[in-house]
Amino acid sequence: TNINWRKLLVFLSLFISGSLLCGLYLPLPAPKMPVVSEVYDSRHQLLTTFFIENRSPINLNEVPPFLRKAFLAVEDHRFYQHHGINPGRIIKAAWRDLTQRRLIEGASTITQQLARNAYLNQKRTIIRKIQELYYTIKLELHRTKDQIFELYLNQIYFGHGAYGLKVAAETYFNKKLSGLNQAEMALLAGLSKGPAFYSPYINPQAARKRTSEVLQRMVRCGYIT
């Protein structure tokens, strides 16, 4: 009987491992990111808009280089070097979780954030973290870094009903992305950490401090001098 149980456990382990490995090579569906629907009259004049999430997707090449670097500096400056998972961050996060005896540290790369926000939920459980790592690997296998970065920038919630960079620029500055100055770009990058707390409408002092932190981080990363 012991031998039979041993064989069964080996079989189940191999089956589960094989299923997971096969699953890695199946691409994920495109993330569901609701966009704005526009209604025009016969003269092509905009009448009204409808949306669940106020979002207008953009291509990565529409994002100014300075703005891209601002996000990389504060969110994941090694994004283009790693494969979606930063072992150093994970070890640091695991240590903090162990010392606090609860899941408090995110340690998320840009790819992990996209996996969590586009496909999973915000629950801080071991199971969800394992799912997040699995989806992260799948994203890295089936999409280029630029595609992942583009999805990430279109997916972020910036507060005040604004989803994605384009709508965020319009909401906070009434500008197109190409018309933003460097301080405005740094502010948008800083909002991703906590749009409710760092909103210039709600907490202008915290927004200014966060903008300064983003610029300082860009200096440390060598993006600006």
Say what each PLM segment does:
Residues T1-T225:
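Juxtamembrane regions of bacterial inner-membrane/periplasmic proteins
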